[in-house]
Swiss-Prot record:
Designated name of the protein: Putative snRNP Sm-like protein
The species this protein was found in: Pyrococcus furiosus (strain ATCC 43587 / DSM 3638 / JCM 8422 / Vc1)
Top-rank lineage group of the source organism: Archaea
A Gene Ontology molecular function term of the record: RNA binding
Residues covered by the Sm domain: 4-76
Amino acid sequence: MAERPLDVIHKSLDKDVLVILKKGFEFRGKLIGYDIHLNVVLANAELLQDGEVVKKYGKIVIRGDNVLAISPTEEG
């Protein structure tokens, strides 16, 4: 049986992920929560630009309708 999208996200809990937003913003952090709407909570969140950290946020919530993709990071 094929994996469902939320199953894949669930496997990334407590691991580092890259969250890409529709407007091109990228956040990296530890995925500590999510819901069925793809609202995500990241700990130690960092805003990236061209792969470099430009701002550190700590804990943030990203609204699911802004999310384009969620991917495990190489460090995670």
